[in-house]
Amino acid sequence: MVMHFFLLFVSNILINNFILVRFLGLCPFMGISRTIDSAIGMGLATTCVIVFVSIISWLINFYILIPFHLIHLCTMTYMLIIAVSVQIFEIIVKKVSSTLYRLLGIYLPLITTNCSVLAIPLMNTKLNSNFIESVLYGFSSSLGFFLVLVIFSSIRERISESDVPMYFRGYPIALITASLLAIAFMGFDGLIKF
């Protein structure tokens, strides 16, 4: 059982990464990754929101939607859970760290529309995961998001100090870098055999 959880954890971080493999969450990936500080803040915020949403969505799914045969309302319910969770988290971040709140800017409310935040509870529902698997799936997927965001932002900081040809400055070199990072993560594909 422990090995199952370990494989789930490692595969979601490295092999089935939401950004580089499933191409979910590309808006904050490209938008907030200019500096490492904002990437760390966004990664932590997204991790907290995803874990909280995974817990609440599993509880609502298991205790309300399934028993009352309302599973067809899961997408709408999860969207509501995400919106409320992000608003709560935004209030907490504003109170705790006004600097982080200003750094994240528009991207903090945009966690609401981050498709990876919605994909995780939907996949938990589809996979019929138990509570521990759901929380671990959410946590490990968000750690994979966080890892790629921090790696990409550190690379972008180095690129911003480099002499890049004029036509490649900005998003073109960022997309090329992201594709090379995705190719590098493809090397983890054979790491786990099920």
UniProtKB/Swiss-Prot annotation:
Subcellular location, principal: membrane
UniProt entry keywords in alphabetical sequence: Cell inner membrane, Cell membrane, Electron transport, Membrane, Translocase, Transmembrane, Transmembrane helix, Transport
GO BP of this protein: electron transport chain
GO cellular component: plasma membrane
Pfam families reported for this sequence: Rnf-Nqr
Presence of the UniProt keyword Zinc in the record: no
EC number(s) given by UniProt: 7.-.-.-
TM helices/strands, residue ranges: 1-21, 48-68, 73-93, 103-123, 135-155, 172-192
InterPro entries assigned to the protein according to its UniProt record, in alphabetical order: Ion_transpt_RnfA/RsxA (IPR011293), NqrDE/RnfAE (IPR003667), NqrDE/RnfAE_oxidrdctase (IPR050133)
Organism superkingdom: Bacteria
Disulphide connectivity of cysteines: none
Recorded topology in the membrane: Multi-pass membrane protein
Localization annotation: Cell inner membrane
Subunit and interaction comment: The complex is composed of six subunits: RnfA, RnfB, RnfC, RnfD, RnfE and RnfG.
Function: Part of a membrane-bound complex that couples electron transfer with translocation of ions across the membrane.
Family of the protein in this entry: Belongs to the NqrDE/RnfAE family.
Protein name in UniProt: Ion-translocating oxidoreductase complex subunit A
